[in-house]
Amino acid sequence: MRGLPMGLSIRGLTRTFPGQGRAAPTLALQPTDLDVAPGEFVSILGPSGCGKSTLLRIVAGLDRPTGGHVTLNGRQVTRPGPDRGMVFQSYTLFPWLTVRQNIAFGLRERGLPEAQIRETTEKFIARTGLRGFEEHWPRQLSGGMQQRTALARALANDPEILLLDEPFGALDHQTRELMQELLLEVWGADTPETRKTVLFVTHDIDEAVFLANRVLVMSARPGRVKAEVPVPLPYPRDWTVKTTPDFAALKARLMAEIREEVRKAALA
């Protein structure tokens, strides 16, 4: 792949949804360019309906752009693939499989040796704090434990990029903060050279700043990246970073950016 861009590269990406009946088509994404380096953790922040999830679904290969293209490590994205792992806000575990079986599902579908499946599954059960819950069914789990399992399942497949679409949005505040810390702990367990690339969609400014080393702010629909804010807070991070002046300053800057777009969305 000599000469090809590494990491995630988005160029001229647009998405228009056809209108229903006589309604006009809806432009969800204006031409969008974006680069995410290998191992980078990027949060995407924006008002409801701005195209955040649409952008993520196109990167995942779950939706097709109207224009432009996406490449991951030099390969054009046209369909879903094991090089991209996704975790949704809604609970997406297979209800007929146990925690262990859910985590192992993708590995087994790829036909990997049973010894490798067991080793990898156990590794991510341990990393995500699921010891003692391996044989539970999804209906027996809290929302937080279901999302731990979904995260473990995505990571077990060893994707090149992890795509998270408001994965903690349905959780209570305390559980949400614990899951944020868990995600950073799992992500930071690898060396800087081998860390997963992460694209994380959220409505929550605190969450965006706490997790990422860069936050992108999207405009009201039709969406585009209107601002890019580096987050120079050192890793590893825990909840105490939220009490610092640097965190407050970043939050205030993002609040100013996002309030303008939320106001536009409300008046649209």
Predicted regions and their residues:
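Helix-to-loop junction immediately C-terminal to a conserved catalytic motif
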Residues: 60
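Short coil-to-helix segment of the ABC ATPase nucleotide-binding domain corresponding to the Q-loop/switch region
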Residues: 97-105
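Hydrophobic anchor residue at the start of the ABC signature
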Residues: 87, 151
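The feature captures the beta-strand-to-loop junction immediately N-terminal to the Walker
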Residues: 45-47
